[in-house]
Structure formats: structure tokens, C-alpha cells
């Protein structure tokens, strides 16, 4: 029974998140089973809450991969410089006028930045002979600090409006989620989790 408690809690939190909001939804339970009956519920709240669950799963897998790569329970993407690299890649592209905040281009640039900084962390750790779990974390913290500072510099180069947008976007928001781009989020996450599963299986077999 205990193994089902997290799933039950997730479903309960999901439904509660659909119900609670600035606007009261009349006949909530009826609207919940009739997608065409309430635009606020199905066009705004449902995509955002679903995206929150999907992104949460992706973050959990990312944390698991970081812990496995470093063999350290406290490792996470933020410590390895991955998060700072993602922010820097996106912010640099936005400040250069190549992409707009919240677009696929910004996400792609962020992904490239994350890959490059994570690779840099491992390369620097290898050069220093510090490929231990503790050494990787120390190098990752240094790389993260450097790229976080670079994000601040890049943000200072854009207009005040763009700087606010970048700041808001960097902290993360579900405000731009729609039923259309929710599909892209779901597909990308499923592919990423499948790749992570394959990596974990191959490592376990060694």
C-alpha cells in the first residue's frame, strides 16, 4: 500500500491545482470530465499543471544522472555548472538578438550551453586529476559561479524590458505554456528520459 502513496498524492495535488486559482470554476467536477465546457480549466490550468508534472519528472531524472555521474548524493545540475551554462547559452543568444525569450531558439541555445559547460566541468576536473566525486563538485561549483557571473554581464547588455524578461524566464515560469507547446514539452521529456534509462541500463550492465 505504501508504494502507491506517492502516486495517490500526485493525483490529489494535480486535481487540487486544477481547482485552486484566482478564478472560481463553477461545476468543477462536471467541467473536469468535459474538455469543451470550461476554457480556463482546459486551456490554461490543465496545460500548466501537466507541464509542472512533466518538468518535475525531467528535473528528478537530471538530478539522478548528476548523482550517478559524480557518485555523490548531493550532486545536481546546478552544482555541476549545467544550470548556469543553460542560462548563459540562452541569455547570450537573447542579448545578441538571435532569439526571443521563451522560444524554441532560446531553449536550443540553453541546451547547447548546458552541454558545453557540463563537458567543461568534466574536462577541467580531468586535467586537474580531480575526477573523484568531491573533485567534480568543486570544479562544478567554480564553473557555475563563472557562468552565473557571465549571465549577469550579458543581462546588463540588453534593454531594461529584455532584462526583466530574462530574469523572469531564468527563474522559470509556466505562464507561457499552452496546449500546443505542451505536446513539445512532453515529447522532449519522454525522449530525454528514454535516453537516460538506456544510459543507466548500460552502466548497470558494466
Spans of features found by a protein language model:
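Alpha-helical transmembrane segments in inner-membrane proteins
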Residues: 1-206
